[in-house]
């Protein structure tokens, strides 16, 4: 990535945004942090409620939501980054959204994921396999994977199961780097 300046990205599991007071506190906090991009997981919006997430100033808001009041992800992109959107891909259950575009003449893709509580490693592995042709060195993947990928993230002596090992193999094959673990 040869972007002349930095790109600030915040990712948060918001654990439901149905309460107005929580939405207002979140909006104020995001305004104060002033990131270029903010990725939210577990918004729990229904299709008719996405308008409830509002921010002052120039922010484009994209949602991936299911029919039930669970899961849900959102991505907020500031106008100050001059991000030209080329493509938005999302699933119907509200577990991921991928936005591809350009900034400073560089192609960039941002994916935010909220993996289901049950079968998270398998879900993420299938998703990464499905979008691997879209992933390159200018792809940023954030979110709540609902699984511990390495032993340091696990309590006591819990072992990594076969599904997580398969996910780690997929991550290695696609050549993804966990910036928090390098």
What are these regions, as identified by a protein language model?
Residues 1-182:
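A shared catalytic/ligand-binding motif for oxyanion handling
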